[in-house]
A protein has these predicted regions:
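A short acidic, leucine-rich amphipathic alpha-helix
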Residues: 26-31
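C-terminal regulatory/effector modules of DNA-binding transcriptional regulators
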Residues: 133, 140-228
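Alpha-helical DNA-recognition elements
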Residues: 41-45
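Short amphipathic alpha-helical interface segments
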Residues: 10-20
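Glycine-centered, phosphate/nucleic-acid-interacting loop/turn motifs that mediate DNA/RNA or nucleotide
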Residues: 49
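Short, cationic-aromatic polyanion-contact patches
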Residues: 1-8, 23, 39, 52-76
Length: 228
């Protein structure tokens, strides 16, 4: 389904990859899908570039587009669509007003990664150490490009060129402040509500930034006292 195929079409595509050249009747028999649905799906798959139609006399058979080729074609089209969308994108406001609710673990993780990849100068991130492991690539890219990275977590973590503070158990709470303009905060992970709030509303950003700054001050004092 990630590549534009329905669940039924994906099942038929898998059948074609295994069996090779088959008729619609054979596909229906092998997959347990009704003949009418099988023929409709095969026609759709041909349009989507997942199968080829082969006519042998009066018999119509189908063969799969090789998996590697199919994937490359889909990715190429997505890249082309992305270029078109970017070139026709309307100018957005510098600051995002209002509040957006993001639900679902995958959507939240996508937002975290995208937010980090768009950082221009600095980012503050607070979460449990296990969640940091999901963001290693994005964090390393920020540090390599000399962006300021401040991390508040609950267990020791080593990141070169980043300031790491170790505080209380973060649980399922996450928070990101990007360039003092955007905030993502809420619950993420198995067993949580998997709901986050995303906003560029200036007052909200300042409040959240102040809260993190106060926590950092307390953790710094605690760290200094340990070294005395």
């Amino acid at each position: 389904m990630e590549f534009g195929l329905t669940r039924q079409e994906a099942s038929i595509y898998q059948c074609l990859l295994v069996e090779g050249k088959v008729t619609g009747y054979e596909v229906a028999k092998l997959t347990g899908i009704s003949r009418s649905n099988a023929y409709n799906s095969l026609a759709n798959m041909t349009e989507k570039g997942a199968s080829y139609l082969v006519e042998e006399g009066t018999t119509r058979k189908y063969v799969p587009v090789p998996l590697e080729e199919f994937c490359k074609n889909r990715i190429r089209r997505l890249e082309e669509s992305k270029k078109w969308l970017v070139s026709h994108e309307p100018t957005e406001k510098t600051y995002l007003e209002g509040y957006i609710t993001i639900e679902g673990a995958n959507h939240i993780l996508d937002k975290m990664r995208n937010l980090l990849s768009q950082v221009e100068k600095r980012v503050y991130i607070t979460c449990t150490r296990n969640y940091l492991l999901l963001l290693v690539r994005e964090l390393e890219e920020l540090m390599e490009s000399k962006k300021k990275v401040v991390i508040i977590t609950d267990q020791p973590a080593t990141f070169e060129n980043a300031k790491v503070y170790v505080g209380e158990n973060r649980g399922m709470q996450i928070g990101i402040i990007a360039d003092s303009k955007y905030v993502l905060t809420g619950e993420y992970g198995e067993g949580s509500m998997n709901t986050c709030l995303y906003s560029g509303q200036k007052n909200f950003v300042e409040l959240y930034k102040t809260a993190l700054s106060n926590e950092i001050k307390l953790l710094s004092i605690r760290e200094e006292n340990k070294n005395v």
